Amino acid sequence: YADGVSPPQRALKELISGTIFAVSENQSRPVHTGCRFEVTETDITVVAVDGYRLALRRFHFEEAAGRVMTFVAPGAALKEVEKILGDTDEEARFTLGSKHLMFQIGEATLVCRLLEGEFLDWRRVLPTENPIKLTANVEQLNASIERVSLIVSERLKSPVRCVFSDNSADFKTVTTIGAAHDVCSVAGDGKNLEIGFNCRYLLDALKAVPAQEVTLELSNGLSPIVLTPTDGSDQFAYMVLPVRLKESM
């Protein structure tokens, strides 16, 4: 356990809570049931993927930490670590062994086995050249999608149909129990782009955004939507894959 990194507890907590919801529950690819940590001398990037979405959070050290490491930590262990971490600037240390990872948080020590396997090449998957960029208030957008998702359930899994036009986002969904429609104002022109989403994935991403406003990056109706910071920083990225829409909605 020679290689150690000591971010503030608050930062590590945000890295975990901002990604853990997107880990896969599918045991056929065990490596994706954990979060990938990429530690450089200047920052820590944490990524989770589950086949339908991607969550990324990044923390920049105030001064170079001097350690470089990449590993995948199990989601179950990270949930326990998240519970122990406080909202404080006190350090939380994690050190990498050959097959294990050790967290030291205050008086607590937690050791977990690393996940092995080929983690998704997320840099190749995350689209960066998205021609449509819209800015939205996170709370308003969240409320709009929540209202139309009231008639969606595990059993009635209808996608939400979104139409992004000039300064507005129009949400509709239809299930066997009814129809719902809501409009949210956004800044920018969506060029009448129509796209379908699993509303739970979009809501999970919005709830994890650590800001009051967010940029929605879009390309076309069959490409993912990416939520990024409005200030152009690389602090977070949330990608959700679209759902094909039936014409009748």
Task: Please identify what each model-predicted range represents.
Residues 1-249:
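Structural preference for solvent-exposed beta-strand-turn elements
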